[in-house]
Amino acid sequence: MAAKPVAERARRLVVLVSGSGTNLQALLDEIAATGTEAYGAEVVAVGADREGVEGLARAERAGLPTFVCKVRDHPTREEWDAALAEAVAAYEPDLVVSAGFMKIVGKEFLARFGGRFVNTHPALLPSFPGAHGVRDALAYGAKVTGCTVHFVDDGVDTGPIIAQGVVEVRDEDDESALHERIKEVERKLLVEVVGRLARNGYRIEGRKVVIQ
């Protein structure tokens, strides 16, 4: 088996969460098991849009810096977006990872981190974008669905696709059961993709993402 490429230095990751942080934990576990150098990246900070979420607690248990940037603490959504961008930029990340971050970022954030902000979605984009991807796939009668790892742009789940994982839809599935199986695939795919982006580098050609 060929050895994994090793990045010249570990890429700096800022991870954004809104809830339980299971994708964050998957990243932390893989980096701990593999080693920062071999994985190619390290988490340098974790941010959230609300206090008291388990994702922040996971970060604190790992000894990582955390920050909270709440929408309601700012007069406008634009000012919140600028404040979030400033908070993230303070840690000088190479990549920003949305690990269940449920807020849509705006122009200021994308001006700084466009092409470097990685998100996951529980459907095979461009099918079933938006907040109810799992429910919509079931309602449509899709026989397969899955998850997408993509870069964030100024649309809703419209950014360039990096990788996808397929999950079969079973006849007995309800939204919860299907979503749990998607999340299992999503966690593994996100960990794999972030590591490859960090170790190998990448380029974006229109809508196509090429990992070197």
Predicted features along the sequence, with ranges:
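Short, surface-exposed acidic-centric catalytic microdomains
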Residues: 39-79, 83
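Short, well-structured alpha-helical segments in soluble
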Residues: 82-91
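N-terminal glycine-rich "phosphate-gripper" loop used for MgATP/nucleotide binding
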Residues: 48-50, 72-73, 77, 91-107
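An anion-binding loop in the catalytic cleft
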Residues: 2-14, 35, 68, 184-212
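Donor/substrate-binding cores of folate-linked one-carbon enzymes
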Residues: 99-208
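Conserved acidic residues
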Residues: 44, 94, 115
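N-terminal Rossmann-like dinucleotide-binding module
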Residues: 2-54
